[in-house]
Amino acid sequence: MTAQIIDGKLISQTVRSEVGARVKARVEAGLRAPGLAVVLVGQDPASQVYVGSKRRACEEVGFVSKSYDLPTTTSESELLNLIDELNQDPEIDGILVQLPLPAGMDSTKILEHIDPEKDVDGFHPYNVGRLSQRIPKLRSCTPKGIITLLDRYNIQVRGMHAVVVGASNIVGRPMTLELLLAGCTTTTCHRFTKDLESHIRQADLVVVAVGKPNFIPGEWIKEGAVVVDVGINRLDSGKLIGDVEYDVAKTKASYITPVPGGVGPMTVATLIENTLLACEQYHSK
C-alpha cells in the first residue's frame, strides 16, 4: 500500500479563499472587514517568520491587520495593558500573542487576559472548556486544522481508535478533545506512557506532536492507518522532517500528511477562519 498524501497546502489555500469570499461579501454588504491584532515580543527568528506568514494571510483575505512588535525589554504589565486596549478596540475581532514569550513573562496569565471572544488561537481556558463540554466556539488552530483536513479528504473517523502522541496544551490535549467530539475512541500518550509501540500498532488514526525527528518508526504504523504528523524538525543539513519516519510509514498508511506541506499551513488558515468566526458571532452588532 502507498498512502494518499494529505495536501495541507491545497486545503489551506481553499479555506483561505473561502474566507476571502466571505469577507468580500461582508464589505460589499456595508459591514466592516474583520480585524486581527498580532503581538510579537522580542526578536525570536522563528516567531518572526510565523508572524510574517500570519500577517500576509490577513492581507490576502482582506482583513484589517494591526501589528505590534514590542522590544524584549517590554514588561509584563505593559503587555497586559496593550491587551486591555485591544480587548476594548471595536475594530479588533482577534488578538494573537505569539509564543514563546521572553523569559520572565507568565504566558498563562497573559493568554488568560485576552477576551475569550477574541481568543482566535483557542488557548483561553474558557474556549478549551467549551470544547471539552462539546459546545466549541473558538477552537485551537492546529487541532481544528487537522479535523478540517480529515473532513476535506472525507476520512470517516467516527469509531476509529485514535492515538495522540504528545499532551501539550497547544496541540495534544485539545486534539484529544477534538477527536472525542468526532466520535473516536481516543488514547493520549505522553512521556510517562509505557510501551508506546503497542499503542501505535493498534491505532487506526495516529496524530504525533512531540517535536522529535523520526520519533515514531514507520514500521509501528498499522496497515491502512491514517497518519497525521504535526512535527516540524530542521536537521543540520537544513532539511525539514516530521516526528514520524515518513518513507516507511507511507508504505503502510492509507493517508499521511507530509512535512512540510501537511499540518503547518492549516494552522494559519484556521487562525484566519477563527478570526472571521469571531467577527460574525461576537462583534457584528
UniProtKB/Swiss-Prot annotation:
Name the residues that bind NADP(+). 166-168, 232
Q: List the Gene3D superfamilies hit by this protein, alphabetically.
A: Leucine Dehydrogenase, chain A, domain 1, NAD(P)-binding Rossmann-like Domain
Q: Which UniProt keywords apply?
A: Amino-acid biosynthesis, Histidine biosynthesis, Hydrolase, Methionine biosynthesis, Multifunctional enzyme, NADP, One-carbon metabolism, Oxidoreductase, Purine biosynthesis
Please name the GO terms that the record assigns under molecular function.
Answer: methenyltetrahydrofolate cyclohydrolase activity; methylenetetrahydrofolate dehydrogenase (NADP+) activity
The record's section on CDD domains has: NAD_bind_m-THF_DH_Cyclohyd
Does the keyword NADP belong to this entry?
Answer: yes
Q: Give an example GO cellular component term for this record.
A: cytosol
Mind telling me which Pfam families this protein's record contains?
THF_DHG_CYH (PF00763), THF_DHG_CYH_C (PF02882)
Q: Which GO terms describe its biological process?
A: L-histidine biosynthetic process; methionine biosynthetic process; purine nucleotide biosynthetic process; tetrahydrofolate interconversion
Copy the pathway line from the protein's UniProt record. Answer: One-carbon metabolism; tetrahydrofolate interconversion
Record-listed E.C. numbers: 1.5.1.5, 3.5.4.9
Q: What reaction is this protein's catalytic activity?
A: (6R)-5,10-methylene-5,6,7,8-tetrahydrofolate + NADP(+) = (6R)-5,10-methenyltetrahydrofolate + NADPH; (6R)-5,10-methenyltetrahydrofolate + H2O = (6R)-10-formyltetrahydrofolate + H(+)
Q: Which family does it belong to?
A: Belongs to the tetrahydrofolate dehydrogenase/cyclohydrolase family.
Q: Briefly, what is this protein's role?
A: Catalyzes the oxidation of 5,10-methylenetetrahydrofolate to 5,10-methenyltetrahydrofolate and then the hydrolysis of 5,10-methenyltetrahydrofolate to 10-formyltetrahydrofolate.
Q: Which HAMAP family match?
A: THF_DHG_CYH (MF_01576)
Note the subunit structure: Homodimer.
Task: From the Swiss-Prot or TrEMBL record, give the protein name.
Answer: Bifunctional protein FolD
